[in-house]
């Protein structure tokens, strides 16, 4: 059975993944699967820079607005949904194109991946849950430095799960998850967009400015009024900072600056993940030849056996 070809476009936030994916999909008769852990949630539009129906240009998109913010959408769920979508898109004679910046989600589709769901130790988890974020992250850094580089200390839920897996298996979380063996069902081409760090950070700051102009504060306030502060989806950048403002613990300008700062740090972590975890064909973003270079790589890839 021949492997299904899949184009995968990755890179940091604000680098230009969406526009490139649309152009490739137009020319290659493709359908796009969002590889973004936040864009699956309805009501989180401005803060996630979610593509609009106009921007889709008639290209069919998948895994956008599929669940309410109160219902968690896990990496395991993304893995199963995406694998089914790849089969469906391919069976209709279309080219599957995955685009996004959530490395864990995208990687789970193409590599032998174990989420460590076989067992739990509720008592151990409760003990971890009673500890503060900094203490937990330092524990992870000591036990599994590789995972600590890729999981932010503010992501308490993910840090706890990593420590729990280490406790249950006796192995580092990073080793338990990925064995770096490609799934033999697919033939992926990983395209990564990169940009000069100063230019990328400038784009990120400008994007946040535009989000505020588009009504991010109102969008976040609606979610805040629905008492969703403790929902995992709301812990994403752009919402948690504004919730702090709504609670009177910061000014609006401080919240905005923190969103920009956290977004820049997130972009740096995204690049670290993709460079360390996946074999990517890197392309310089923001140039007149970006699309042409990407298209040439895709054509060569599709022509190969």
UniProtKB/Swiss-Prot annotation:
Matches recorded under InterPro entries: Dimethylallyltransferase (IPR039657), IPT (IPR018022), P-loop_NTPase (IPR027417)
Annotated residues for binding of ATP: 11-18
PANTHER family membership: TRNA DIMETHYLALLYLTRANSFERASE (PTHR11088:SF60)
Chain's role: Catalyzes the transfer of a dimethylallyl group onto the adenine at position 37 in tRNAs that read codons beginning with uridine, leading to the formation of N6-(dimethylallyl)adenosine (i(6)A).
Subunit structure: Monomer.
Record-linked HAMAP family: IPP_trans
NCBIfam families reported in the protein's UniProt record: miaA
Protein name: tRNA dimethylallyltransferase
Natural source organism: Listeria welshimeri serovar 6b (strain ATCC 35897 / DSM 20650 / CCUG 15529 / CIP 8149 / NCTC 11857 / SLCC 5334 / V8)
Gene: miaA
């Amino acid at each position: 059975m021949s492997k299904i070809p899949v184009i995968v476009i990755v890179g940091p936030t604000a680098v230009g993944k969406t526009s490139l994916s649309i152009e490739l999909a137009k020319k290659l008769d493709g359908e796009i699967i969002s590889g973004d852990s936040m864009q699956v949630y309805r009501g989180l539009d401005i803060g996630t820079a979610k593509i609009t129906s106009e921007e889709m240009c008639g290209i069919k998109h998948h895994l956008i607005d599929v669940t309410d913010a109160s219902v968690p959408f896990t990496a395991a769920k993304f893995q199963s949904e995406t694998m089914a979508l790849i089969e469906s898109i391919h069976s209709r004679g279309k080219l599957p194109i995955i685009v996004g910046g959530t490395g864990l989600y995208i990687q789970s589709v193409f590599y032998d991946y174990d989420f460590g769901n076989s067992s739990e130790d509720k008592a151990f988890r409760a003990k971890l849950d009673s500890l503060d974020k900094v203490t937990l992250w330092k524990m992870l850094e000591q036990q599994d430095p590789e995972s600590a580089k890729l999981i932010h200390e503010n992501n308490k839920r993910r840090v706890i799960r990593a420590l729990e897996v280490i406790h249950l298996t006796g192995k580092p979380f990073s080793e338990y998850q990925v064995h770096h063996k490609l799934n033999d069902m697919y033939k992926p081409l990983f395209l990564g967009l990169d940009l000069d760090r100063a230019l990328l950070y400038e784009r990120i700051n400008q994007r946040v400015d535009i989000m505020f102009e588009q009504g991010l504060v109102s969008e976040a306030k609606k979610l805040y009024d629905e008492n969703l502060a403790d929902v995992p989806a709301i812990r994403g950048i752009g919402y948690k900072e504004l919730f702090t403002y709504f609670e009177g613990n910061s000014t609006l300008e401080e919240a905005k600056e923190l969103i920009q700062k956290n977004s820049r740090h997130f972009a740096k972590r995204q690049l670290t993940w993709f460079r360390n975890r996946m074999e990517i064909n890197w392309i310089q973003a923001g140039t007149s030849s970006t699309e042409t270079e990407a298209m040439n790589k895709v054509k060569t890839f599709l022509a190969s056996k």
